[in-house]
Amino acid sequence: EFRRVLFRSLQDTVDVARQLLGKVLVRKIGNNTISGIITETEAYRHSDDPASHAYRGITPRNRAMFEKVGHAYVYFTYGMYHCVNVVAKSSRHPAGAVLIRALEPKSGLDLMKKNRNTDKISNLTSGPGKLAMALDITKKQYGEDIVKSKILYITDGITPKKIFASPRIGISAGLEKKWNFRI
């Protein structure tokens, strides 16, 4: 097993979004392991980011973004999808999280296909809601300590040769920030 990636220190959310690319997101369910290489992320900070859930302050939904780094912030959107984020913030920005937008499936393909009800590998984890569904990530994992957890964690993976940056997807504010990163 790859050693776990430790995100215990305060680091800028945008830097962590880049660092997560190429790492492996792992989900253990009983004796099954599902994993994928992180291929796309988005950074969401605090007071300088009107697209962030943390922009207007702490709420019951976003409280994880204000708490310990390295924990999961999972939220429900569009009435049907969960999205998984890793809390990452700096001393300058007291809240933040990195949305994991896409994965390249690595292990547990059969279970991913079953969870997503599709055989199309290219469609399994090609969006934040799809990957959460494929890895069976729900609000039950909200606040999960990704560094210490045995059911949801991140390990070393590959070193990206090139990282592409562009504006984030599906937002109406903060469009000038090129905080969508992909390999």
Label every PLM stretch briefly.
Residues E1:
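Short glycine- and acidic-residue-rich catalytic loops of nucleotidyl-transferase/cyclase enzymes
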Residues R4-I183:
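Conserved, well-structured core segments that form or line functional sites
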